[in-house]
Amino acid sequence: KDSMDFKNSSWNHRYDRLLRKKVLQASPENALTPAWGQEVTLKMQGVLEDRTVVEKDCKLVFVIGEGDVNQALEECTISMKQGEIALLLADSQYTYGHLGREPDIPAWAPLLYQLELLDFREKLEPLSLPIPDRIRIGNQKRERGNFYFQREEYGMAAQAYCMALDMLTTHTNDSQRCASEEEDEEVNDYRVKCLNNLAAAQLKLGQVDEALHTSRDVLFLDPQNVKALFRKGKLLSDKGEYEEAMETLKKALKLEPSTKVRGPIMKYSFFTIISLSVYISSKY
């Protein structure tokens, strides 16, 4: 605990004093360091300046560069050798920034970590993993995307959703299906959630064509998905494809009473259908 000191004078300044590292236990000279894109296993504890523990994991597994953890942990881990124990003092710009993390990390709070690099290896390909592991990892990526989306970091959110979709597959290397009917259905459900979330992130990024394509991907898997129908109808209307937009929105409104979609989206669709009907009628 004495080593967990925010004012320690023997820090190695790595990035303009925003990330500072001190080795507590060095590894042998011939020990290796992980590379970008490899999977690492880290023992980690993070505290605020008042010593409140806000992050702790005795076996944190993540892939360097995939945004599974904050930037401070990625940057430090790639500098460590296997077996090394180090302190990392991270400015908020490399952790949780001006938003902090509810409910325990205030805005602009620096964090002090004690880290031990337990192991690292090449990232496993999704097609080599059992289906339950694919579902678990894919869902973790999706939840990380939700974390970024809520922070309005839409580029990172879209990246996380795409990585989740890469993981959420039931095929093998020879393109054969390897899942039970129940697993196949569960993977499909998570893919639909990821695709809907990805479309929302793409819209926030102004990627209208991509969002329309993603919405169509949702409807390929779930033709009665109301969120995707509303989004597709609105995007088609915005692009001037009025007849297809009207048919899509009509289908969404027909399904809507049995769904949880309410409020502004429904009002928008109702008035859009009226407007499109008038416009299309005037053409003939």
Residue spans of the language-model regions?
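Cross-family detector of peptidyl-prolyl cis-trans isomerase
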Residues: 1-221, 227-255, 261-284
